[in-house]
């Protein structure tokens, strides 16, 4: 599971794309299931433009799945692996505001955070209790302490509640 930001920005140099591609293809050729979550550095600010890891989805690379929208994956979606994965890729502020019609980004994020909590609860109710559940998200966690590199980020992150990621039904959070 790769939880987003394959590159430092949304327009990677061809050399970086080549080297990243070589590594993903090695995983594919070894038949190692790989989930690539789209992160904020992978996305263009313009709605409708391709993201930086789009080629793996477009080319339908075997054993590689690109996750660009919230999804609950079951074994049949995961090459019959005995696991369930809840995927939360980055949700852009502009895309979110366009989708909700909100003009206040704080209110838009608050609404989405509530909806994500409700969606995860719904997925947990639908889950198979005999299989492990992984939550993977490209988001900040309420109350988390970040390293020094985090200080350069702007304050527009989607924030998941600590209670959500500490849910006892989740076996792993990435």
Which sequence ranges carry the predicted segments?
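Contiguous mid-protein beta-loop-alpha structural module that forms a pocket-lining wall or clamp
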Residues: 135, 164-174
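Beta-sheet entry/capping signal
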Residues: 33-35, 132-134, 172
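Detector for Asparagine
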Residues: 40, 115-118, 156, 167, ...
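Core catalytic region of metal-dependent phosphoesterases/phosphodiesterases
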Residues: 1-75, 165-168
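Charged helix-capping and loop-helix junction motifs
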Residues: 15-21, 151-160
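Conserved catalytic scaffold of divalent metal-dependent phosphoesterases
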Residues: 48-158
């Amino acid at each position: 599971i790769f939880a987003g930001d394959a590159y430092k920005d949304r327009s990677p140099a061809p050399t970086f794309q080549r080297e990243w591609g070589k590594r993903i293809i090695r995983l594919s050729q070894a038949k190692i299931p790989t989930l690539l979550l789209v992160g904020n550095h992978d996305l263009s600010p313009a709605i409708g433009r391709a993201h930086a890891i789009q080629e793996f989805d477009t080319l339908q690379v075997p054993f590689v799945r690109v996750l660009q929208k919230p999804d609950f994956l079951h074994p049949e979606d995961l090459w019959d692996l005995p696991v369930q994965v809840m995927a939360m890729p980055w949700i852009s502020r502009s895309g979110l505001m366009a989708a909700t019609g909100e003009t206040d980004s704080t209110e838009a994020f608050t609404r989405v955070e509530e909806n994500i909590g409700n969606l995860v609860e719904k997925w947990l109710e639908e889950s198979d209790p005999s299989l492990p559940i992984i939550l993977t998200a490209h988001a900040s966690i309420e109350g988390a302490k970040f390293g020094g590199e985090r200080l350069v980020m702007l304050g527009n992150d989607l924030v998941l509640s600590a209670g959500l990621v500490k849910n006892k039904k989740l076996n792993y959070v990435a």
